[in-house]
UniProtKB/Swiss-Prot annotation:
Free-text remark on how the cofactor is bound: Binds 1 zinc ion per subunit.
Catalysed reaction, written as an equation: N(6)-carboxybiotinyl-L-lysyl-[protein] + acetyl-CoA = N(6)-biotinyl-L-lysyl-[protein] + malonyl-CoA
InterPro entries: AcCoA_carboxyl_beta, Acetyl_CoA_COase_Trfase_b_su, ClpP/crotonase-like_dom_sf, COA_CT_N, Znf-ACC
Role, per record: Component of the acetyl coenzyme A carboxylase (ACC) complex. Biotin carboxylase (BC) catalyzes the carboxylation of biotin on its carrier protein (BCCP) and then the CO(2) group is transferred by the transcarboxylase to acetyl-CoA to form malonyl-CoA.
Location (main, coarse): cytoplasm
Protein name: Acetyl-coenzyme A carboxylase carboxyl transferase subunit beta
Length: 308
């Protein structure tokens, strides 16, 4: 103990100024655990600038950063889930829906928008994984069919960003029926000669991967995305064999021909726009910086609290 500490009590030795860091300014990469400035991460489309790990992205933000500004019209937002079976497990289905809606800010697990990407008309939809694991229920199926119908009506392509754990067990057979319903809708789109591009993000599993996600004219995976039907442990217990490392990652699927390409999220707008233009006989879109988000806004660093 120093001579000063002997004279003064520690309780009386305080800092003249107490600084505080506002919430939401910093975050940590879920892969490399690097501490990141959140505004920089947002500008980088939530891809870690240190290790290129693709973090999970909110459905609405994904569509807003993918589609051109001023061209977006949401479809099917009036559709809301209903508890027709009065389902109850450890909680009532109604309670789970209310909690998911509050946590995610969405009415259900799929967001659909009509717009354009680099000037190429498209209908785009994205799964919201934070809404009950992106599970597919009646509203998800209905909104996806609405997206297909809009693509047919406007004679344009359809793209879907999948992020789902599969069918929603609380809706039982009505949920499983959405696998057939969405697949039949995509058949109608194909009959019209219109393209469907499926982008599988982390994770795309269960009934979604077994239906609409794998039915693209072109199937794209984001880097290191988990894509499959059943989980690794379930499969190993069934076949009683040890499976290869990373066998459900997009790189493994590309190597074995299950998907067509892997595209970095920052390159997605340019790549998809070029594919859609070629598949619909339109002029190739202008090449732009892949880091330009269409709704980029300046970010001011909040001042630290000066009260001490």
């Amino acid at each position: 103990m120093s001579w000063l500490e002997k004279i003064l009590e520690k309780s009386n030795i305080v800092s003249s100024r107490k600084a505080s860091i506002p919430e939401g300014v910093w975050t940590k990469c879920t892969s490399c655990e690097q501490v990141l400035y959140y505004a920089e991460l947002e500008r980088n489309l939530e891809v870690c600038p240190k290790c290129d790990h693709h973090m999970r992205m909110k459905a609405r933000r994904r569509l807003e950063t993918f589609l051109d500004q001023g061209e977006r019209v949401e479809l099917g937002e009036e559709l809301e889930p209903q508890d027709k079976l009065k389902f109850k497990d450890s909680k009532r289905y109604k309670e789970r829906l209310a909690a998911a809606q509050k946590a995610s800010g969405e009415k259900d697990a799929l967001v659909v928008m009509k717009g354009a990407v680099l000037g190429v008309p498209v209908v785009a939809c994205a799964f919201e994984f934070s809404f009950m694991g992106g599970s597919m229920g009646s509203v998800v199926g209905a909104r996806f069919v609405r997206a297909v119908e809009a693509a047919i009506e406007h004679n344009c392509g359809l793209i879907c960003f999948s992020a789902s754990g599969g069918a929603r067990m609380q809706e039982a057979l009505m949920s499983l029926m959405q696998m057939a319903k969405t697949s039949a809708a995509l058949e109608r789109l194909s009959d019209k000669g219109l393209p469907f591009i499926s982008v599988m993000t982390d994770p795309t599993m269960g009934g979604v991967s077994a239906s609409l996600a794998m039915l693209g004219d072109i199937n794209i995976g984001e880097p290191k995305a988990l894509i499959g039907f059943a989980g690794r442990r379930v499969i190993e217990q069934t076949v009683r064999e040890e499976l290869p490392e990373g066998f459900q990652r997009s790189e493994f699927l590309l190597e074995h021909g299950a998907i067509d390409m892997i595209v970095d999220r920052r390159d997605m707008r340019q790549r998809v726009a070029s594919l859609l233009a070629k598949m619909t006989g339109q002029a190739s879109p202008l090449v732009v910086s892949v880091n330009d988000a269409p709704n980029e806004v300046p970010y001011a660093v909040p001042e630290a609290n000066k009260k001490g």
